Amino acid sequence: MLHAKVVYDSSLHFLGFIGGIFAILGVIVLPITSGDTAFRAARLQIAEIFNVDQRSLPKRLLIAVPLFVLGYFISTIDFSVLWRYFTWANQMTAMVMLWTAAGYLYRYHKFHWVASLPAWFITTVCALICSTTKLVSA
């Protein structure tokens, strides 16, 4: 509960009432949409690997229900452990995408710095996360 109070107090103090409400909604909505996207992506990837058509509801549930059960058991793990991996994976995805875009722009003689500089920055962030965060407990 302490984290919720910190978010509430700091959002209202720094952003005012309206900005604070938007910030608090963002803290609630963004993790929910990330979870929704993760479940959808996992379901579609599994369906593609096993060639399961996803047009009918029963076939969607065939894959979704086991994923939800797995998600339930994962949610019983300490949130700080889950968050550690989520933030790392999120930053790594951004880094790979930025370097891919930078490579594409460079190859076709476009202004690649628009992607290269942020890619360099996020690579530094990822390196710092990996060096300062204990991703695997000993």
From Swiss-Prot:
One of its GO terms (cellular component) is plasma membrane. Its main location: membrane. Keywords: Cell membrane, Membrane, Transmembrane, Transmembrane helix. It is a multi-pass membrane protein. It is found in: Cell membrane. The chain crosses the membrane at residues 12-32, 62-82, 111-131. InterPro entries: CstA. Coiled coil: none annotated. This is Uncharacterized protein HI_1127. It comes from Haemophilus influenzae (strain ATCC 51907 / DSM 11121 / KW20 / Rd).
